[in-house]
Regions:
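N-terminal hydrophobic/helix-forming segments and targeting peptides
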Residues: 1-158
Length: 158
């Protein structure tokens, strides 16, 4: 049963993380629940043996680490890495146009997606929007769970 629970937790994480920004927010909520301490990347850190810490950059990447009770020169250290983004299509800024009752969004390929898997199926939008509010740039996570888009597959002779 433990293996099934681990798989279910992973699937829940993947489903809840449609963008790097969502993934980092999900990871941060787990870290806070187990008493990790967030550090400011630009500040001098006060670290303690056995401490559990993390740093977030641009809300799209996260680094976490746990200090042992001995100095790394005595006990060594381990590093594990992963990335929170995945291949896909990203909406270009100011890339929206419309004509004949249809809206079109300019997109750019990010990473190395298998493009055929995006064609002729319902798609939606998730990510981070940035906007100006009272002379401040603010960011907000967005996720639309209903189908909004479709990329038509053109006939091979087109």
């Amino acid at each position: 049963m433990v293996a099934q629970q681990c798989v279910q937790h992973l699937l829940d994480f993947i489903d809840g993380s449609p963008s790097p920004w969502h993934a980092v927010a999900s990871i941060e909520s787990v870290l806070k629940a187990v008493q990790f301490v967030q550090l400011d990347e630009s500040a001098k850190w006060q670290l303690h043996a056995g401490g559990r810490y993390y740093v977030i950059r641009d809300n799209s990447s996260i680094v976490l680490f746990v200090l042992g009770n001995k100095m790394p020169i005595e006990s060594g250290f381990k590093i594990v890495g992963a990335h929170t983004d995945s291949p896909g299509l990203r909406i270009r800024p100011n890339g929206a146009t419309s004509s004949d009752g249809f809206a079109r969004l300019g997109v750019e390929v990010y990473g190395g997606p298998i493009l055929a898997t995006f064609a002729d199926r319902d798609l939606s939008v998730a990510g981070r929007i940035s906007f100006n509010s009272n002379e401040q740039i603010l960011h907000k996570l967005v996720r639309f769970d209903q189908p909004l888009l479709r990329l038509p597959n053109l006939a091979i002779h087109m």
